[in-house]
């Protein structure tokens, strides 16, 4: 605990006075699933109708009838636990189950080609410093920035009084796009643009809607105990839509960017400190293709400027806070260090919502 306190004191005052921490909740996995999210919903009722209405604007009109009809029918394909959680959220919020399910599969429906995608992006960074510590930084950028800031929450998923895994997510959303299994690994998801509407729809039917990516990440965090197991699951499993899945572990070279198509990994790009590849930067572009993304270029320049020898959690915050890595669409920033003895506490304390 003393080490955690020292590290937190060293976080720079790059976070402006308007930055704030997300609300923290414990989701008790020993409770009936239909009751787990009740307090979260009660605390955010005033924001929920606006979020749902805004979400509808980002579903292309040709897809809207299918999406909302299908969303009201497909929860039966999810695990029983997820089904019951969704029904509980719908009941507590007073919103139709179709709208709740639709919110939770929005990424999977909308992750199509760049010409039609709404403003969705992220920056994920994994770095190994000279002491061997693995540090995972993440900015989540999203077009509904102001609305999402009001419903961003930090959740510890607890069983038998012990934190099993943690995640940054949103009220109404029981999946996870940014998370950590304490003492083992952390994960973040970035959008990857590949294919067209019909490709996602066909894959959804093929998988019988069983694997929305946010539910899958949560499942991996709960059931895959190690970095190696998690990377294997993230690389091999069929998913609805393309994505970049970034994973950080606790041992040498345990950091990877998995560029996913719908079937499996299209590319796996790991840390390799022996070849001086001590950091990985992923935004929303394939790392093996030429591209001019200013966020990625700036992050790489900043990492090289700071250097590996003295790189630490404070340094990662500095990279995440540099414009345009941090930009007008950034909802929150976080730093995860899964190898810390108090990694769950650190994750909770090292997340901030931008003003």
Curated annotation (Swiss-Prot):
Q: Where is this site: Important for enzyme activity?
A: 138, 284
Kindly provide the name given to this protein in its UniProt entry.
N-acylethanolamine-hydrolyzing acid amidase
Q: Which cysteine-cysteine pairs are annotated as disulfide bonds in the entry?
A: none
Per the record, the GO terms for biological process are:
fatty acid metabolic process; lipid catabolic process; N-acylethanolamine metabolic process
Q: Where is the active site?
A: 122
Can you quote a single GO CC term?
A: membrane
Report the subcellular localization: Lysosome; Membrane
Renumbered to this chain, the signal peptide range is 1-17
* Assembly mode: Heterodimer of an alpha and a beta subunit, produced by autocatalytic cleavage.
Q: What does this protein do?
A: Degrades bioactive fatty acid amides, such as N-palmitoylethanolamine, to ethanolamine and free fatty acids.
Per UniProt, the keywords (alphabetical) are: Autocatalytic cleavage, Fatty acid metabolism, Glycoprotein, Hydrolase, Lipid degradation, Lipid metabolism, Lysosome, Membrane, Signal, Zymogen
Q: Please provide, alphabetically and separated by semicolons, the GO molecular function terms listed in this UniProt record.
A: fatty acid amide hydrolase activity; hydrolase activity, acting on carbon-nitrogen (but not peptide) bonds; N-(long-chain-acyl)ethanolamine deacylase activity
Q: How does it sit in the membrane?
A: Peripheral membrane protein
Keyword check for DNA-binding? no
Q: What is its EC number?
A: 3.5.1.60
| Catalytic EC class | hydrolase
What family does the entry list? Answer: Belongs to the acid ceramidase family.
């Amino acid at each position: 605990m003393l080490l955690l306190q020292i590290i937190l004191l060293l976080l720079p005052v790059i976070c402006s006075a308007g930055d704030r921490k997300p609300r923290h909740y414990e989701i008790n996995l020993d409770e009936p699933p239909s009751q787990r999210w009740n307090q979260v919903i009660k605390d955010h009722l005033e924001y929920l109708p606006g979020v749902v209405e805004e979400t509808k604007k980002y579903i292309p009109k040709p897809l809207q009838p299918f999406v909302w009809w299908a969303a009201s029918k497909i929860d039966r394909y999810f695990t029983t636990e997820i089904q019951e959680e969704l029904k509980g959220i719908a009941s507590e919020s007073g919103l139709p189950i179709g709208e709740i399910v639709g919110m939770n599969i929005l990424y999977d429906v909308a992750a199509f080609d760049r010409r039609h995608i709404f403003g969705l992006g992220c920056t994920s960074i994994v770095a190994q410093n000279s002491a061997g510590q693995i540090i995972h930084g993440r900015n989540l950028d999203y077009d509904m920035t102001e609305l999402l800031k009001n419903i961003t929450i930090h959740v510890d998923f607890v069983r038998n009084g012990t934190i099993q895994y943690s995640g940054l997510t949103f009220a109404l959303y029981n999946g996870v796009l940014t998370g950590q299994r304490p003492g083992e690994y952390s994960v973040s998801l970035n959008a990857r643009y590949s294919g067209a509407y019909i490709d996602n729809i066909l894959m959804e039917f093929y998988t019988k809607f069983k694997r929305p990516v946010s539910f899958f990440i949560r499942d991996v965090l709960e059931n895959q105990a190690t970095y190696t197991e998690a990377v294997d699951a993230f690389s091999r499993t069929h998913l609805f839509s393309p994505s970049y899945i970034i994973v950080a572990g606790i041992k040498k070279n345990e950091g990877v960017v998995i560029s996913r198509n719908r079937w499996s990994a299209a590319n796996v790009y790991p840390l390799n400190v022996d070849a001086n590849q001590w950091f990985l930067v992923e935004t929303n572009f394939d790392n093996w293709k030429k591209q001019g993304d200013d966020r990625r270029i700036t992050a790489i320049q900043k990492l090289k400027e700071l250097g590996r020898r003295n790189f630490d959690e404070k340094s990662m915050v500095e990279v995440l806070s540099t414009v345009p890595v941090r930009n007008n669409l950034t909802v929150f920033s976080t730093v995860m260090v899964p190898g810390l003895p108090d990694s769950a506490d650190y994750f909770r304390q090292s997340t901030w919502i931008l003003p």
